[in-house]
Every structure is written in C-alpha cells, then in structure tokens.
C-alpha cells in the first residue's frame, strides 16, 4: 500500500509504474503539444527543434527566450489529452489506491489540469528554489476542499539517471517550515 508511505515516512512512493506503451503515449501527447506550440512561437526554428526532439531541446533552446515562452498555461495538456490519460491503467491503479478522484484545476482553466515541465540541464532558473507545495496553497494559489486530500503525482518523462532535477526531502510534509511570501 502506498498511502502509509505518502502520509507518513518518507512522504512519497515510487511503487507505482506506468506500462511502457502508456509511457510512450504520454511522451507523444507532451511532444505534440511542445511541437505545436513551437510552430506558433518560432516557426523559423521548428526544423532545428524537431531535429533535437524534446529530449535534446536544450541544444537549440538558445534560439528562443526559454524563460518567457514556456509559462505554465501553455504547458497544460489539452482536454483530449487529459481524457486519454484518464483512461490509462496507471490512473486506474491510482483509483485502486485512493478511490475515485478529481485532478485539480489549480489555475482555474475550467477543467482538470495535467501539465509538464521543461527543464534544461545546468539552468538554475528553470527550477524553483526548495519549497513546500503547501506554501503556495496556504498563500491562496489553489485550494483543497475540507473533505478532500491532495496527492501530487510527478512522472519523469525524459530523465538521465542521477541527474534528475526533482528533489524531495523525506518527511518534509510532517514539519512546519518557516517561510514568507515574496511578491
């Protein structure tokens, strides 16, 4: 059972996996959105980006202003992709563990949000500083209804072993960390 690991120690679980066919489809859904968006913002560079692919995007990212062209709103998968993901067996496994669930609409787009990140190697501005997601919720970005529990699912799409940019501090969710908002 993954719930004791998530709610207690260490605060996360890596017990759930995605079947290779579904993982490939998830990559395709993200790639299609990535490629489609690049066609709108940098049509003159699409060929170069396609040569690199999303997994080597960083090799051509100098051609655009990465920091300004990839806000979260353009990385939220379209409804048809979310509907397809909802039918995947790994989502069924999540429902087996947690019961039926909603995927949150944190940015008020009017539907369930599944989004992806695009982080380049050795680019410190592509990642946020160490933080607790609950801080954002405490400050009013997204809400969790009283009768709900929030569970965050992170899936590495293109990751080099040992070089993953995602860091989780075990048991950090059990502590009250001091913080302050910076506007």
What are these regions (language model features)?
Residues 18, 120, 157-159:
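Non-catalytic surface loops within mature trypsin-like serine protease
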Residues 1-107:
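N-terminal auxiliary "cap/dimerization" subdomain that precedes the catalytic jelly-roll/cupin core
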């Amino acid at each position: 059972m993954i719930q004791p690991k998530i709610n207690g120690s260490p605060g996360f679980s890596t017990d759930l996996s995605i079947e290779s066919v579904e993982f490939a489809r998830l990559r395709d859904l993200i790639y299609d959105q990535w490629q489609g968006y690049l066609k709108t913002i940098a049509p003159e560079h699409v060929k170069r980006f396609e040569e690199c692919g999303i997994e080597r995007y960083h090799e051509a990212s100098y051609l655009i202003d990465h920091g300004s062209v990839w806000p979260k709103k353009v990385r939220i998968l379209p409804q048809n992709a979310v509907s397809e993901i909802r039918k995947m067996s790994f989502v069924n496994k999540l429902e087996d563990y947690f019961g039926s669930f909603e995927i949150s609409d944190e940015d008020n787009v009017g539907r369930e949000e599944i989004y992806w990140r695009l982080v380049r190697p050795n680019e410190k501005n592509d990642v946020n500083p160490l933080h607790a997601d609950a801080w954002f919720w405490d400050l009013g970005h997204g809400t969790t209804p009283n009768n709900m529990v929030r569970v965050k699912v992170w899936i590495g799409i293109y990751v080099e072993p040992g070089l993953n940019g995602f860091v989780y501090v075990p048991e950090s969710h059990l502590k009250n960390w001091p913080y302050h908002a910076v506007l």
